[in-house]
From Swiss-Prot:
It holds the Pfam family AP_endonuc_2. It comes from Salmonella paratyphi C (strain RKS4594). This is L-ribulose-5-phosphate 3-epimerase UlaE. Belongs to the L-ribulose-5-phosphate 3-epimerase family. SUPFAM superfamilies: Xylose isomerase-like. Keywords: Isomerase. It catalyses: L-ribulose 5-phosphate = L-xylulose 5-phosphate. The keyword Hydrolase does not apply. GO terms for biological process: L-ascorbic acid catabolic process.
Length: 284
């Protein structure tokens, strides 16, 4: 029987850098996490994962089986560099090829959810054409994901195009496909002028996972928990009352810290205390 416990995961970039997934998953287990979210960002090193050999993919599957710590999701931020809305046909084609490879990779190793970055373009100026190309690129991507039975889930971003659940729902309704859902980040959601609880309630039925981090207006990364504007207890309580039973992922970038494990343990305890106050988990 599956546990009724709320699944709590940690972002890969919170843990020490490196390519040994067995070591990473063992550490995550020691720290009390149920799963790790993989990052495929715009760096050549992490993009290279999409070209892993059969043996490398099997090694990841084996590490999951040995440790019992899952890798159910991928944060695919590589589209900052190769955006689906690019007006350069070659760049856009590369973005679609990255999507194809990511979906194939997910299918091979058991990743169920690919979190998408909601940028039509990132390093260029957005306009009506980039938004149109982005929509068309999403449609093509969701068609690929449907055939592979892999869910694409849109993150709520640090970018105006996708800075609320309401805006992301517009894309969900446009695509009208069960393999396209939402993956809100309560930090990003709170950093904008959103009615956060109303937004979370609006997304119920489409939310497949939740990123947990703190933010300040205009500051979307590396804000220590408790020093930002996020009302964690209210967010957790709203999600619980709305019937959300899915995973929560602590998002941090402590892989280059002097002691990443200690940083993660501190954040884990802080977040779990707020979860307990909201009735999501039992108090320690």
């Amino acid at each position: 029987m599956l546990s009724k416990q709320i699944p709590l995961g940690i972002y890969e970039k919170a843990l020490p850098a490196g390519e040994c997934w067995l070591e990473r998953l063992r550490l995550a287990k020691t720290l009390g996490f149920d799963f790790v979210e993989m990052s495929v960002d715009e760096t050549d090193a992490r993009l290279a994962r999409l070209d892993w050999s059969r043996e490398q993919r099997l090694a990841l599957v084996s590490a999951v089986a040995e440790t019992g710590v899952r890798v159910p999701s991928m944060c695919l931020s590589a589209h900052r560099r190769f955006p689906l809305g690019s007006e350069d046909d070659a760049v856009r084609a590369q973005g679609l090829e990255i999507m194809r490879k990511a979906i194939q990779f997910a299918q091979d190793v058991g990743i169920r959810v690919i979190q998408l970055a909601g940028y039509d373009v990132y390093y260029q100026q957005a306009n009506d054409e980039t938004r149109c190309r982005f929509r068309d690129g999403l449609k093509e991507s969701v068609d690929m994901a449907s055939r592979a039975q892999v869910t694409l889930a849109m993150e709520i971003m640090d970018y105006p195009l996708m800075n609320s659940i309401s805006k992301a729902l517009g894309y969900a309704h446009y695509l009208n496909n069960p393999w396209f859902q939402l993956y809100p980040d309560i930090g990003n959601l709170s950093a904008w002028d959103n009615d956060v609880q109303m937004e979370l309630q609006a997304g119920i039925g489409h939310i497949v996972a939740v990123h947990v981090k703190d933010t300040k207006p205009g500051v979307f990364k590396n804000v220590p928990f408790g020093e930002g504007v996020v009302d964690f207890e209210s967010c957790f309580a709203t999600l619980k009352q709305s019937g959300y039973c899915g995973p929560y992922l602590i998002e941090m970038w402590s892989e280059t810290a002097e002691n990443p494990a200690a940083e993660v343990a501190k954040a884990r305890d802080w977040v779990k205390a707020r979860m307990a106050s909201a009735g999501l988990v039992e108090a320690a």
